[in-house]
Amino acid sequence: MLKKRYLVLEDGSYYEGYPIGSDQLTLGEIVFNTAMTGYQETISDPSYTGQIITFTYPLIGNYGINRDDFEALVPTLNGVVVKEASRQPSNFRKQKTFHEVLQEYDIPGISGVDTRSITRKIRNNGVLKAGFTDEKSEIDSMIAKLQSVELPRNEVTTVSTKSPYVSTGYGLSVVLVDFGKKQNIVRELNARGCNVTVVPYDTSAEAIIRMSPDGVMLSNGPGDPEEVHVAVEMIKGILGKIPFFGICLGHQLFALSQGATSFKMKFGHRGANHPVKDLKTGKIALTSQNHGYAIDKASLKNTDLEVTHIAINDDTVEGLRHKSLPAFSVQYHPEACPGPSDSNYLFDEFIDMINEYKTKELTNNA
């Protein structure tokens, strides 16, 4: 008889399936991701720290997992939910199965459940707390635990680097503030010749200025931006002194530093096919997204920020630019991985902004 596993939700519902991955059972906020591919990059994205991911695509793991495509050295999510997990993947780059990697990193999961039903529940009711148990007799106690437990709202401290390190390049010097960065951000900067110094999330503005970088990148990361107060103060300190570009959580922190506010979304944006409109050009780009918080558009009225991009599906803010200083941000992931590369050009715009600022500084000092 096959062993059973149960996914239990705080609203009192539960789903019966089969165990995959680790037997180290956990709980967390359950969310859904609509991407059809890129499950390796998804489970290793630090922005999912503490969450349980429901994959809406029905077959996960069919091309295996390799050592090169991780977005972080160690995945930090709390679980996965799939309709079916492939045990016999086929791909020339495959080194391990999805199940083996979940076991290696102590990530529990469940398969054989109705992921469409779970996704509809989250879409209609909002994200929920959820947990796993292998004993049906424990379901009631798990529901009570979920209804009373407070989940962490600031996971940045968990995933940020503890000390600075360098990813060497031959050109511009960029400081990347690590709130839970994806490795492909570093790859994209290195591909443009940037010498990247990755620093902890709580690095002060004074410390960054002493490094004399040409630019600063504010990375993605997990959790509630309102909880990362130290970064808001740092951004205030570098604005106007060093050009910077914010992505995802970095975008939200940029907005908060200028007096805007954020809010928790009902079910967030998580997937690789979210359409975003550039308000300047009118062009639509398909983007990779992973966020459960957004910036309140009304709160931008009395700031020096202008909205540059909006989400087509729900009209939420997807991009900002300072009206007079060299700083901009996007809510989505231009580095993709997984997802389309429609917005990869934003890294080039960042480089152009740095060079324009350097030229202006040279002219002013001449």
From Swiss-Prot:
Record keyword Amino-acid biosynthesis present: yes
Any Pfam family hit: GATase
Catalytic activity: hydrogencarbonate + L-glutamine + 2 ATP + H2O = carbamoyl phosphate + L-glutamate + 2 ADP + phosphate + 2 H(+)
Active site: 248, 333, 335
Gene3D superfamilies the record matches: 3.40.50.880, Carbamoyl-phosphate synthase small subunit, N-terminal domain (3.50.30.20)
Chain intervals for the UniProt region annotation (CPSase): 1-170
Residue span, Glutamine amidotransferase type-1 domain: 173-360
UniProt record, GO biological process: 'de novo' pyrimidine nucleobase biosynthetic process; 'de novo' UMP biosynthetic process; glutamine metabolic process; L-arginine biosynthetic process
Record SUPFAM superfamilies: Carbamoyl phosphate synthetase, small subunit N-terminal domain, Class I glutamine amidotransferase-like
Enzyme class: ligase
Keywords assigned: Amino-acid biosynthesis, Arginine biosynthesis, ATP-binding, Glutamine amidotransferase, Ligase, Nucleotide-binding, Pyrimidine biosynthesis
Pathway: Amino-acid biosynthesis; L-arginine biosynthesis; carbamoyl phosphate from bicarbonate: step 1/1; Pyrimidine metabolism; UMP biosynthesis via de novo pathway; (S)-dihydroorotate from bicarbonate: step 1/3
Residues the record lists as binding L-glutamine: 47, 221, 223, 249, 252, 290, 292-293
EC number: 6.3.5.5
Superkingdom of source: Bacteria
GO MF annotation list: ATP binding; carbamoyl-phosphate synthase (glutamine-hydrolyzing) activity; glutaminase activity
SMART domains membership: CPSase_sm_chain
PANTHER family xrefs: CARBAMOYL-PHOSPHATE SYNTHASE SMALL CHAIN (PTHR43418:SF7), MULTIFUNCTIONAL TRYPTOPHAN BIOSYNTHESIS PROTEIN-RELATED (PTHR43418)
Known partners and oligomeric status: Composed of two chains; the small (or glutamine) chain promotes the hydrolysis of glutamine to ammonia, which is used by the large (or ammonia) chain to synthesize carbamoyl phosphate. Tetramer of heterodimers (alpha,beta)4.
NCBIfam families, per database record: CPSaseIIsmall, PRK12838.1
Family: Belongs to the CarA family.
Stated role: Small subunit of the glutamine-dependent carbamoyl phosphate synthetase (CPSase). CPSase catalyzes the formation of carbamoyl phosphate from the ammonia moiety of glutamine, carbonate, and phosphate donated by ATP, constituting the first step of 2 biosynthetic pathways, one leading to arginine and/or urea and the other to pyrimidine nucleotides. The small subunit (glutamine amidotransferase) binds and cleaves glutamine to supply the large subunit with the substrate ammonia.
Annotated protein name in UniProt: Carbamoyl phosphate synthase small chain
Gene name tied to this protein: carA
